[in-house]
Amino acid sequence: MIYTSKKIIIFLFTIMQLAILASCMDSGYRLSFPEIDDLADEYPAQAKVFLSRADSNDNKGYYKLLTAKIEYQLKGYIYKENDIDDAINIFVNEKDEPLLARSLYYKGASILNNYRDTAKAIKWFAKAIAYDSNMREKEKLDMYNILCRITHQNIYTVELEDEARQ
């Protein structure tokens, strides 16, 4: 009886240790970069968590693009512009036009939001437009909305200047 109860206690203790050990381990569930990319469109905070679990060496350019995209979506600006610059260089070398177009868009958006330099931003958007047939629809629409907003602001500014001259 005592021998059996010791076996039961040891067995239960072993099961508890395994449960605790399993709960402390990483789940191991990782999303691929395209899945994280899709998730970032609607839920950038959750995408950031999955991106932190991803191996940045799998596809450095895509990883850096997603880092910049998620940061831009969460904060409205890109703090580390060297990530997007690295992504652009990688995609130019790999001749990956869809990801290059998206990287150029985020570079232009970053310049516009960080420095309010409309002329430089438009130059980057113009480079992205050269590849826009390969861009994702959401980013293409966002880019054209930004360009329309810039155009509208410029027209409004010209109208105000004309009124001021009169």
Q: Over which residues does each language-model region extend?
A:
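Bacterial N-terminal signal peptides that target proteins for export
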Residues: 2-12
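Bacterial N-terminal signal peptides
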Residues: 11-20
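A "functional boundary" signal
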Residues: 24-166
